[in-house]
Structures are given as C-alpha cells and as structure tokens.
C-alpha cells in the first residue's frame, strides 16, 4: 500500500503547476491585494437601455432585419456587440451561442435568438462578416472564436474596447464591461445573477433577459462612442503619475480630506443618536478605510503585507456578491475561448470529456466566496482568468503530461459507456429509415423551433445541421455508435407521450364532414344594424369606388363608428377586409393606425391609397421620408406601422390620441399573434399593451385564417373587451383545387400548366411556385429557364436588393412566374395571380390556405395545384422532431396528418379545407361551386365518369388482415426499429439486418403477396390514422416505429375477435381500376383515370371548353386575329357562371369584348410603366373586364364602374381614349350601362326571356347533375353535401320553372302520382293545393315530401308543362355552361317492371298528352342558355 501511495504522490508531483488548485489560489491571493474597488461604486446609478428592443427568433425575419441594418449603416460605422449562451456544460460540450445582440443607435437594439432557429440566418452571417461595419465589445476576440466554432462564422472588423480604452486613457488596465461603464459613464451595470446565469437558449426570452442583453450591447456602443470623442490630450491615468499630478495639489487634497474627517469625528458624539441610517454610515466608513489603505500602499509602500493593519471586514456587502457572479460569467467566457481555440487546431472527442470535468472543477472553485469581505471580486476573477487562460493556452505542457490527461479522460469515457451499454439494445438495431438529405429553407421551418416551453429544463445536446455534409457526417457517426453499442436510447419519454397521440380518426373526420349537413340556409340574412346613410355611401364611392358595402364589411365598420367596439374579423382572402380599417378614419377625418408585419405590402397599400387621394404613410425604422411631423399635424388619415415600432413607441400613440384622435387600431394578419397559428411572431404578443395605453380606441383584428381556438387566442392576447367576432365563409369559389404526384422530372411535372407560344413557353397568367427549400427553387428555376420562360427566384438567402427587384418586376408583370420559398407571397399586393403551384407537400392546412390565398384576389377564376411525393411528408415529419414543446409538437403532427389526408383523399377537396376551419356555413358558401367541375379534381372526376360519392368518395376497403400482420410484426420485433425491418420480416427477406431468431416465427414471410412499396404506403396510412407512430430513438435522424394506444387496443381486439379495419383506399393501396365504381363502365376511348390525378383524355369539344374556363391569355399576345374561341382570357367568377338568369350574349359581342379587353390590358401596362406603379394598382382585371363590357368614354361614366374612385377615374383617362378609338374603328356602341344594351343582345334577350329556366345557382347544379349527368338523387345529395330532401326540392322547383325532368327516375312514377292526385281531389283536401300540411298527413309516409310538391306543380301546370317522362336521346343540355350532348338513359324492363312491349305502349298511352311536349321546350331552352365566355 505504501508503494502505491508513493507512486501516486510521484505522479501528482509530475503534473503541471497550473493543475494544482492550491497553487493557483495562492498565486491569486498574492496579487489580489493591489486591486481595490471604488468607494462610490455602490451609489452609482444603473445603466439602462431605454430605446426600442427588436426581438427576432425567426431566421427569415432575422435575415431581413440584418439586411436592413447593413443598408442603414455607412462604411466605418460601429455597432455594439455582445453574445449570450447557457452557462451549463453538458456531456463535454459547451453551450452554443443562444443570443446575439447588436445595438445600432441609442434608440434601437436588435436581439437575435439564434438558438430557436433551425439554421443560422444568412443575412446575419453576412452582417457579422461585413468588414465595413465595426463590432465593438469587451472580450470580443473570444466571441470571434466562439462564433467560428459554433456556426463557422468569421467575425470581421471587431473592436476590443479594452484595447481602445487603454490606448485612449494611456493605461494598461484589464477592463471589464462594467468597469468601463463605471469609469466612463459614471454608472454601473445591473448584474443580477438570476438573469445573467439563466438559460439563454430557452424560448421566448423574458423581458428582464431582453433588457439585460440589450443593455450590454448598448454599453458597448456608447462606450466606443465616448472613447472615440475622448481627446488624446485628456489623461485620466498615467504610467508615471508624478509627471501628471503636481505634488502640491496632492498635499492640498490630503490635508483637506483629513480636516474634514477630523471635523466629522468631533460632531459624531452629538449626531450619532440622530442618525437615520447608522448601517449606511458604517458601510461608507468601511469603504473609506479600504481606499485609504490602498492609497497608503501606493504612496508609502509596505514591506510586510502580512502584519500590516488592514481595514475591518466584518460587513458582508452586496456588491461582493455581484462581483463574484461577474467573475463566474467572465471565467466561463475565457474558458469558452480556450476550448474553441483548441478545437480549431486539433479536436479530439476525448478532450470533450476532459474539458467537461476540468470546467466543472474550475466552476466549483469559482463559486466559493473568499473570507476577505473587501476583496474586489470582479478584478480578482479577471486575474484568475488571465492566469488560467495563459496556462491552458501554454505550449509548455509535456508530451507525458498530455498522455496522462488523455488516458484519464478515456478511462472515464469508457467506464461511462460500459455502464450505459447494459441498458442498450443490440448493435444490430441500426436501421435508419430517414436517410434523406435535408436542404430546407429557414422559412419552411419558421414555426418548428420557436415554440419552446419555458418549463422545458432538459439539456439538449443536439446541434443544428447547417449543410448536407454535416447531416451525412452526423448520420455516419450515429451508425458507428450503434455498431459499437455506445448510444443511449432517448425515446422512452417521447414514446410514452406519442402512444397517446391524438391524430384525427376516421370518426373525427366524418364529424367534420357532417358539420355542414344541416340543410340549406338563405343566402341573405336580415341584419340588426341600420343601413349606411347617404353621406357614408358618398364617401365610399368617392374614395374607394364602391356603391355599397358588403354585409360583413358594414357590420364591422358600423360597430367601430357608432359603438367604438373592438372587433375580430375573419374574412376570406379577396372579401375586402382592408376596407374595414381604411374607411372609418377617412370618413371621420382622424387617424387610423394599421399594424402589419409586411413592409412590402404596406408600401403598396400606401401607394394605392395615395392614388385614390387618401393621405397615407408608412412609419418605421426603415422609413426614409421624415413623416413624423406631418403625422403629428394630422395630415395623414391612415398610418401603417410594424408591430415592433408600435410596441416601442406607445408614448407617440398616446400623444396622437390626445392631440388628433385615433379612429381605430387595426391589427392586420392577426393570426400571427397566436402561438398555435401557422405564422406566429413574438412581436405581435406585445401588442396586448395597446388596450392598456389606449383604452378608448377600438381595436380591429383581421385575418383570413383563424380557427376558433386561434380566434380565442387573439382576443386574449390583445386584451380585447367584449369584442364583436365576425366570420365570413372561408370558401374561395373562384379557386380550382388539384393534387398530383411528382414524377421526379420537374419539366414533366410543370408542363401541364404551360402553353406553347411561337417562340417560347409561358404560364397561363402570373404564377407563384412554392418550393420547400432554396435548393429546390434554384432547380425549378433552372429547368424553366431552359424553356426561355421569364421567371425569378425568391428566398431568404438572397440579398435584400435582389429580392426587392424580383418583387418589383413581378407585380409590374415584367416576369410571369416567381419560384419561391414560403417567405414570398404574404407581402405581395398582386390581385391577378392565376396559378399557385406547390412543388412539394405543404406542411399544414392553415399555411396551405394562406398560400393559395394569393391566387385570384381579383375574383376571376384561378387554380391551385399541389405536386407532391411521399418523401415530402417524411421531410415535414422529420422537421417536427425539432420542436421541444411536446404539446405543440403533437398539435403540429395532427395538423400535418390532416394535410396528408387532404393529399390522399378522393373526397371534395374544398369540403376538406372548409371543414378544417369549422366553417358552419360550408354549404352556403359553396352552393355555386361544390360538386361541379370547377370545384376540384375529385369533383371533376366524379362528373366525368358519372359516379357519385357512394362509388368513389373515400373508397373504403377492409384492410384488417394486412393491419394485423403489420402491427403484429412491429410488436414482435419489440418496437425497436423503423418500419423497414417489420416489412422485411413480413416479406420473408434474407437480409442480415433481420436476426435469425425471427425467421422461425409463424408470421415470417406472410406478407409476400404485397410489394415493399405497398407495405410502406400502408404503414403511412396506419400512421395517419393513429395506429402507429414514429418517434426519435438514438438521435433526431433515426426513427423507430411503435404502436400507439389506439393501435395496441385494436391489435388486442383483433387477436380475440374479427380482424376488420375499414380504411380509406388510395391509388397506392389499391389499383386505379379498382377505385373506379364497379357499376360504371368507362368507355374504351377514355384513358384510365386516377382520382388524385386530373389530366384525363377529353374529347375535343370538352377540352376546348375547359381551356376556356381555366386559361389566361397574356396581354401582349392578344390581338383581333387571335383564336379567342379556343383560349379566352378568363371566365367570370363562378357565382355568375351558373346563374341562368344572366343574358346570353352573341358570339360577335363576346369577340368584341375580348379583343377590347386585350387592348385595355396593353394600354394599362404602358400607362403603369410611365407612372412607375404596379398595373393592378392602377386598375384591376375586374375593372378592365367591366370597361370592356360597358365601354365608357367619359370620366363620369367610368366612375360608374365598381371599384373606380374619383382619384382613379382621372388616371384612367388614357384607357378611355383606347375605348373611343376601338369603338369608332369597329362601329360598336359605347357607354353600355343598365339603361342600354347592345342591339343584338337586346334582341337575343327578348327572345330568351320567356324560355329561360329561372333557377338559382344551387338548383341549376342539382338539375344538371340529375337530368344531364343521370346521377341518382342519393348520389347528388352526397356529392353536394346536402340532405336528400333539399335535392328533391330543387327538382320540384325545376318542375315549377317548366324545365324538362325525368319524373320516373326522380321517383314520381304514375302510381305515386295517382296516389297523390287522389288525396288532393278527395275530401278533406277537395283540390285545395295550398293545404300542403294536410296533404302530407294523408299521403303515405313512404312517399317523400318533394314528390308531393312535384305532383302539385304538375297538376297546376296542366297540359302547358314541358315535363317529360324520360330524357330524349337527341336532347342537349339546358344547364348553362356546357355543350356536351346528353347521353341516353334507357331504362331496362326490369327497372320499370314492364314485361312486354305491349304493356309498355299501353302505359305510355295512359300518360297525359302534354307530357310529350318536353322536347320542344328543351330545345328552345338549350338555345337560350348556351355558355358565354368572360363577359356573359
């Protein structure tokens, strides 16, 4: 034992001196006595930053703000710089930089919370590496190495304030930031340990943390400025003080001080009893004693420090605590610098563990307080830092010493592994199913990492993957660790929570579907508020160009003007929500404050308002024009501000309210307030103080996307008081929805949306293509440019000027298509976007709805397409694993599952979207479109193949046996692997990944009847339905598949009962031919059809018609010689397309209107270019359509067009000249308003007036589906999402209108008709057909009510009715909007129960003679209701 002790002692003596903690303490003890703190430090006021703090946690916003900073700074300008990171060491790794602070002026500081961002923002990186901008701070050299290690960012042109101070002050001090603040500013920093040592990586930061961080950066900025203006001749310190300070002056000062002290000593006995604060006096005396001691040492010196009298230390001052904690933080900074420098040279994983233990020892020693109460903790710790840093950075360590350190670290590392390996799974558990490369834009992940729970105190050792190479290396390391058995499972907690994942079940989905099945409601409701008066309508027309308010608009405006009430308005895109906040201040004559996060959109709206003679401005940090003075003078009606500016300038708003008056405060895009929304922004959460500061000003929160939970969150966060909540329908009836699968070939995927011109390809109108990553945007752009297509790329990695140029060119129609990440779109003010294409699966329903909302804002027909692949869903699911807030992550998983169902579904896509937003008026909003070929690809498919929802919608199959096999396989393999291994098990694979023990199981190889891709698709279906769940296991790149509670319960039940599981089938699980209804046969000339892929081979006539419906011809390609019949501009909105009361115009008139429209578009483009404004701001497409119809020639007449204000009317004068010239050249009428019509159109209207079917939109659709498509009533009811009774009543109204109807197929057979007629003729009815209730009571219950109504209408019309017993073969459609010949529908003898031709003939002879006149009526009707084009 003694020998071992000697060896140990010898080994310890060989260790370097700097490793001996005792020696280190002694060295510090010897040097600390010369450092004394100022006696006045405790009385110094605290330095506090009073300007506005811009807190950004989103990578995209951070890039934008950084670029704004760069643009606002000149070369050589300086910003205050500082960084924060968690103080803890975890598993041998130091915490990464969590927060970067930049102070650009005395009034503004930016906090960039990079720990909540998935990747480091490109704009911030460019700013930090910009040599033209100086970054000033203390310890900034260490910060440089920290940034280089954590993010590979080379901080350039940094200024170390310590060096500048020593140079200016001619001294050699070791300064801390606090000591510089004390010396130069006469203040001190508030160093609260609970704040400075808090976890800076947690989201969001507290207000105290924000103020602390901003103050540090501000201190660096203001110190640099003070040092710069400090004259070199001013010397506060000198190396030889005798040369700078006269001896006589020092004598005078010392004598004066001694006299004052003696005088105080004389007065003390009499004044002591009257002292209010004796303790404070004692503290001041102690401070004086300390400084006197220091002064004595400096002047006289001391030969014996040990025995010399020292000041009393019996008081425990709070300042010592501050200084000690300050030392801890500074020490950590130095240690970070050391480790960073070492890693940059040669970094070995074992050094992580060495650094960890060494760091812990040092920290432990640092926290211990010294007994000497007067010691200056800050300076003491600075001395320690310098010593330790010098030691650690020293190259004097011997090779033998280094080997000892490495050996110790390796032994600890291996022992830790040996302990943990007993709890690990076998090294064979190394499956990695998600081995795809992530190349994602910050914008796609903008919400994934920002919703971190404040209570989540777990240490996260993962780091952000910033490149493909990092990802691949991390995955390779993961596999190596698996093979060596050195990885600890971390999935148990996630697995426990995700087993109960509340993904939407089939029952829940059906509840959503049935939400609207409550019967039809009236389109118009009587409102309880008074109509606008004449003065209000005049103001509306003068400034906004409208003759009336929409009902919901007036509801909001009236409550603001008359009741001064808060409002939450959820309005579909294109409804006109901007009028709700623009009109009140214009009418009242005061200021309206509009808060919006979108600078580009605000600039466009300001321009648009100015063109309508409404004074408006944008007020913000990026505003170049000085408008603040004019605002205070009340010269502006509408003022746009950012949420950051608003929250930082409450005093200005209160001043405006007091001096001028604020009519309202509008919060646009209010869904950004909610943490559960798809576009949450923290700056919006601060707007809750608005109501406190301005309690009498009504707040109007507006958005286009907000479910009920988000609406509640908006009310709560804004502190709204008894708000009026108003919702329009979420439906956008002019948008056609379509989903397709990607093929992997970009050009092949996008070609269906392109048209070929003489020289190049082009889209059918302005188009946005959304991509999930920057890399994909560049790939798509490259492919499209091969076709000479004018397009541009837009993403956050581009410079601000480049992005602004792309936006400018797109809104001015200089480029036709923008390929962008989701950073683009919300801020665009372009109403005529015809197509929105998602090249990749959207991440959730809310963001998808917001993005497609960019299309068709002018009310004209537009289309929205999704091109996706299963890998897109995998990528989105993987990104969700980054969310540390478990509750929010599960919520996002549920939202993503809904999106996945949308992509797979064969149901009406419009219905899926509307049911997600809980639209209670889903059927009301969609009566004119849902179930038609203009609704979505699924609805069009049903119409093309004449089958109903019964046959096709969500075709259900029993997948019970397959589900039992797959769930059992996952369970048998212990839920330790991804889905790949259970599939190999079921398919009987010989792969070495599958252990031999599993090959003897009875289920092994039982799934050979299905392909591997089928099983993977089926597993995704089970995940979507909530039977399986994927969770992270070893690290975030590897997933295991586990049973949820729902899946385990089903499996247990299937073991004992029947194995039945009814799921929705899609094209991956069932062959396409099986998805077609068995009762229907597709003709041999029709291409095999897939429900999720629309492009089927159509007849020439139908194809031409669809092109007319959905195509858009650019202005520069239109001429009088164009083939307009095949490709028109665009049809009108669907609300009017199905209204059979619209007059039918002649082909000549339609041709005239279309050619004139093309000339107007050209003239608008030229005029807009001269004015340097976007064409759509000058005049929307809808205004041009109306101008082509009405052909006004005077300014007064153009004002009569809806949407043309007085200001705009004058600007449209050049377009009136175009109309005059065109009409004179072609000899056509002008100024065609309600009192006049084209001569030929008048004649046509007179002929058609008495023969047109006066059916509503909804009734016309039902009639067409029944009479022409030959769909059964039940199928129509399911397709239209309406009750069967409602469908029947639609047909009874068709009978009343005199439209031909196949009565027998409707259910009104002669037998039923006779029963009803007998009831009506006999008592007690006695032929009184007004007694509907009595008739209903007497007619047998099995006869539906709508049949009674039909029979009554037939009896009323008598022989003049145009009804028919069956559809004539040669009859054409009477439903407006189609030219397709109605197919014959001959019923078999079995269907009608007739056995012989004779009996059939006798039956026909018994029918009323007037039944045979249907053919005539139908022909005349069809002639009248032929489809018009854009201008019908």
Swiss-Prot record:
Q: Write the record's keywords in alphabetical order, separated by commas.
A: Acetylation, ATP-binding, Chromosome, Disease variant, DNA damage, DNA repair, DNA-binding, Exonuclease, Helicase, Hydrolase, Isomerase, Isopeptide bond, Magnesium, Metal-binding, Multifunctional enzyme, Nuclease, Nucleotide-binding, Nucleus, Phosphoprotein, Repeat, Ubl conjugation, Zinc
Q: Where is the composition biased (Acidic residues)?
A: 507-525
Chain sites annotated for binding Zn(2+): 908, 935-936, 939
Q: Where is the HRDC domain?
A: 1150-1229
In the record, the effect of residue 212 to F is given as: Strongly reduces exonuclease activity
Q: Where is this cross-link: Glycyl lysine isopeptide (Lys-Gly) (interchain with G-Cter in SUMO2)?
A: 154, 241, 252
Q: Which SUPFAM superfamilies match?
A: HRDC-like, P-loop containing nucleoside triphosphate hydrolases, Ribonuclease H-like, Winged helix' DNA-binding domain
Region annotation (2 X 27 AA tandem repeats of H-L-S-P-N-D-N-E-N-D-T-S-Y-V-I-E-S-D-E-D-L-E-M-E-M-L-K) maps to 424-477
Q: What is the effect of changing residue 577 to M?
A: Loss of helicase activity, loss of DNA-dependent ATPase activity. Does not restore chromosome stability in depletion experiments
Q: Which Pfam families match?
A: DEAD, DNA_pol_A_exo1, Helicase_C, HRDC, HTH_40, RecQ_Zn_bind, RQC
Query: What one GO molecular function would you report for this record?
Result: G-quadruplex DNA binding
Offer a single GO CC term for the protein.
cytoplasm
Q: Which residues carry this modification: N-acetylserine?
A: 2
Q: What is the effect of changing residue 1367 to R?
A: Associated with a higher risk of myocardial infarction
Residue interval(s) of motif KBM 2? 1403-1412
* Reactions it catalyzes: Couples ATP hydrolysis with the unwinding of duplex DNA by translocating in the 3'-5' direction; ATP + H2O = ADP + phosphate + H(+)
In UniProt terms, what is the effect of altering residue 993 to E? Loss of DNA binding
Q: Which residues bind ATP?
A: 546, 548, 550, 553, 574
Helicase ATP-binding domain span: 558-724
Subunit structure and binding partners: Monomer, and homooligomer. May exist as homodimer, homotrimer, homotetramer and/or homohexamer. Homotetramer, or homohexamer, when bound to DNA. Interacts via its N-terminal domain with WRNIP1. Interacts with EXO1, PCNA and SUPV3L1. Interacts with PML (isoform PML-4). Interacts (via KBM motif) with XRCC5 and XRCC6; promoting recruitment to DNA damage sites. Interacts with RECQL5; this interaction stimulates WRN helicase activity on DNA fork duplexes.
User: Which disease does its entry mention?
Assistant: Werner syndrome: A rare autosomal recessive progeroid syndrome characterized by the premature onset of multiple age-related disorders, including atherosclerosis, cancer, non-insulin-dependent diabetes mellitus, ocular cataracts and osteoporosis. The major cause of death, at a median age of 47, is myocardial infarction.
Instruction: Quote the function comment for this protein.
Output: Multifunctional enzyme that has magnesium and ATP-dependent 3'-5' DNA-helicase activity on partially duplex substrates. Also has 3'->5' exonuclease activity towards double-stranded (ds)DNA with a 5'-overhang. Has no nuclease activity towards single-stranded (ss)DNA or blunt-ended dsDNA. Helicase activity is most efficient with (d)ATP, but (d)CTP will substitute with reduced efficiency; strand displacement is enhanced by single-strand binding-protein (heterotrimeric replication protein A complex, RPA1, RPA2, RPA3).
Q: What is this protein called?
A: Bifunctional 3'-5' exonuclease/ATP-dependent helicase WRN
What is the organism field in this record? Answer: Homo sapiens (Human)
